[in-house]
Amino acid sequence: MDLLINIDVDDLEKAIAFYGTALGLRVGRRFDFGVELLGASSPIYLLVKSEGTQASPMSADLRRYRRHWTPVHLDVVVDDVGEAVGRALQAGATLEGEIRSDRWGQIATMADPFGHGLCFIQFLNRGYDEIALPDNRPR
C-alpha cells in the first residue's frame, strides 16, 4: 500500500514556502489544483481549496483556515525537536504549549499557518518500544 498525504490550503505559494522551510520539502510536480511536495517518506499534495467551500458533499462543514481540530494530523519524526520547532516558527507555525518529554522522546504540538495540527517527534532511548505493552497483548 502506498500512502499519499493531501493538505487543503487557500494560498499555494504561502504553503509551499512554509512546508519547504519548516520540513525541508521540495516541489515535485505542479498541477492546476496544487503541487506535489517531495522529501518525506510519502508525497504530500497541497490542494488549493477556497475558504468557505464545502468540505465534503456528505457534510455541511465548510473549509476554514484558522486553528481547527481534526482527528488526523501529521507527526514528523526529527533528529532535534528544538531545531525543528525553530524552523517551523520562523516559517509561520504556532507552538501550542511547551515541548514535552517522556521516556520515549520529546514532542512539540504545533499548527501550520492554515490551522492544521502538526507535531514534531524526536525519539530517544528505544522510542515507542519504551512504552509498548509486553508481548504486544491488548490492555
Each language-model region and where it sits:
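Vicinal oxygen chelate
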Residues: 1-4, 26-75, 83-111, 122-139
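Short glycine-/small-residue motifs
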Residues: 117-120
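Conserved active-site tyrosine of GNAT-family acetyltransferases
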Residues: 15-20, 88, 115
